[in-house]
Amino acid sequence: MSKQEPVIKVSSEVGRLRRLLVHSPDSGLGKVVPSKAQDWLFEDIVHLETIRKKEYDFYTKLLLYFLDPGLILGKLKNIDAEKNKRNFYKPEHKEFFRSDKVIELQWLLAEILEDLEIRLKMAASVCAIENCSYDTQKELLNLHPVALAKTFITGTLESDRMLFAPIPNFIFTRDIGIVINEYVLLNKPAKKARTREALIAKYIFFNHPFFKAYQENILELNDGYHHFLLPKESDDRKVTLEGGDVMVVTKDHLLIGVSERTTMEAAHQTIQLLFERNIVKKITVIKIPKKRDYMHIDTVFTQIRRDAWVMLGVFSKKSMKHENEDSVQRALEGSKKDEKLKIIQFRKKDIENPVSFDNLEDLLTEISKEDLQCSGKIKFIYSGNNEFPFDAREQWTDSCNLLALKEGVVLGYDRNDKTTEAFKENGFQILHAHDLIRQLEEGSLNVEQIGRAHV
């Protein structure tokens, strides 16, 4: 790792990806049962080997080719040989790839658990959260750090005995914390099922040598005064924030979603904290309907280039205008505050005079033109190609939730056919992961040659 290269720095949603935290699908995903799907916030009953071998392994390969090619280029035949039993992809195995660019959280956890003091504190904390017996706590302390890290995440011992619930959402690593320039804002999950994730993330960020130089740059939100006295219906006054509701569009401009998982009070506290620390100059709060369909703002829009965005059409200018012109609908639904889009922008130098936007397209256009100095027409690619019912169906299966490997090159799911058509119609090349990996491995293509593409 270069001494000049910062470990932590994010000032764009579409800049060249250098490092990211990941977590491989663990055995806990295979323990999810229908009766606990709502409680554990994981509604898919997955076939574990399928999502590992036919989905996540391909994702890992692509990340390594783009971020850490020395670990994979020219070695894939041996890595994927049947005799090696996927050991390259298993975080607990000695043959695991252990990249310092594609960074596995389970390994970071195992490394900090080598410290006895941390091991004692974490075992006590996890057992308190999960209401375990003292005997269980002692049993955990007898485990090797690698095995203990795995159990903290999966909830299961090597013997396959379950001690407590899995945390299947740990694979969504964006939610555990947000990098804003050279700062890390830790999350405060809205649901109890994600409390253990937040605890693990906190211990890693505050204790792993990888983040040692950034201890003063780790930010946490505090619960409000007498928060424990708030009635359940006062949800907006509670402080909950998840990473899917925060986007760093430029070094000076942050977007915060107020959603099913992130509260207005959390947005308020984040604005105060970031402005006081001079971390950004402008923050836009995007209040979306509190619906499971949307969950976070990154499920309804994502930036794919400085001048291009993918989004759900119901928040477009045309759709919002039609809704506002329908006087009957407006009269009937006027009181449904939680079902309306609201966008307010605050500037540190003029915080008393916030600016409002009527629709998402106007905000995103301003970001591209004013913040990012784009002079041409701003492109909007719509979920499901803006066709009913495909727009809603494909948004549910993450058509708007993409990962930019570099500007104009994004990773998405192959199941969203209509959205893929929309990308193609807007000049993007559609690349299938299997074919792209083959070309990268044989040398007929390199990552620098890939321009505008949906993978």
Report the location of each language-model feature.
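The feature marks the mature, well-folded catalytic cores of soluble enzymes
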Residues: 2-452
